[in-house]
Amino acid sequence: MRHGKICAETYYAPYNKDSLHRMFSITKSFVSMAIGCLAEEGKLKLDDKIVDYFPEKQPESGTYKYTAMLTIRDMLKMKTCHTKTTYKNPGVTDWVGSFFTTKPTHVPGTVFSYDTSSTHVLGALVEKLSGMTILDYLRSKGLDELGFSKDAHILTDPQGIEMGGSGMCASSRDILLMMMLIKGDGALNGRQYFPKDYVKAAKSLQSDTYGKQGTFEEMQGYGYQIWLTRNGGYVLFGMGGQLALYVPDKDIFMITTADAQGRQGGVQLIYDAFWDEIYSAIDSDSLPENKKAHDELIKYCESRTVMNITGSSTSSLECDITDKIYICDENACGVKSIQLNIDKTTHTGHLSIKNNDGIQVIDFGMCTNEYGIFPGYDLEYAASAAWRMEDYLLIKIQIIDSAVGNLYIGLSFKDSYLTVMMRKTVEDLFNEYDGIFSGRTM
């Protein structure tokens, strides 16, 4: 989007402009705006101590000294007292409580250390002080009036509290709307929705990240739950390539949803493509009309689909292995047996995996996607398979639901033996689909 007009827009089927996508840490920026609104209402002050709002969550032995020093402003800056997300510790069910019962490592308000549990606590604070969920509170502040998706929502933790650090499911246009509000210092269409001074501070440098973060784009600094970028820009950033980027000097927005999990440097590639191919090519002059180029762009945008794996759709081994049951060695994945079926007529197949929960059947297409609901998880998926080598079939399963990620299941056949390679890139789920083991046909 540039100068208030969408220049190009494309979605990869089955996604479309109304599809909800997991936005991961972009949720944090929404929590930040809600905190700013609560401060404007006088329901909190940024320099308040967070422990004062959660006395019921403090350890029985007493509040930790460094935790007691922590302010809401420190949390917004990601300068907390923890070095990692506390609710990911083993056995935790009370996510908010874990933030206060986990022993802190350092004085807060000093150094940047990315901590999703901190923002989760801020989200819980929004619910506590507003009496509403995070999104409902922001809807009351203007998101509904501006056309934010009615079915957008935030997933909840085991206690039923919205996951303020990572749980939002919304459309690309929803994220563009929030970014337009942030660009306008909280105002849009001549009306002030969020507090101006707060929004200006939120997109300004509050924390240095240069020595802490691992990718170049994340080394440019941090505001109040908003990242800074090269060339004076700022971005709402969610894991795997969820980006809402705005660069003032070119007045350009870029919104992306993606799944770069499991691809080292994948998100940086998106940034680099934008800087190298789009940002650097923009100048103040309008381009001359070019109908051919325009039509080619439209055709390209309308033809996108989620990728499928490539390779050969057939193998000389198929007749020997189809429908045979392979009994698996004892393994960490809990898989007891595997059966593969490939239909040469329909170019589809299914994999039957017997584990501790019964038989899980995964349908797939050969070099094309088949869609279904993943057994045991009730999540939509797209799956394709290809013979990457004559004796090696690889199945790629894309989770395209409130969870986002990939599962890879590789089947290597050698005489009467089958070796299975499973790898998952879905956060916190599908742990039983990660490992290597072998089996033998009956």
Model region roles, listed by residue range:
Residues 1-15, 251-254:
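A short, well-structured edge-of-sheet supersecondary motif
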Residues 22, 41-80, 101, 130-166, ...:
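Active-site helix/loop module of the DD-peptidase/beta-lactamase fold
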Residues 118-125, 164-187, 242-259, 275:
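Active-site-proximal alpha-helical segments within enzyme catalytic domains
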Residues 144-203:
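Active-site-proximal binding-pocket segments
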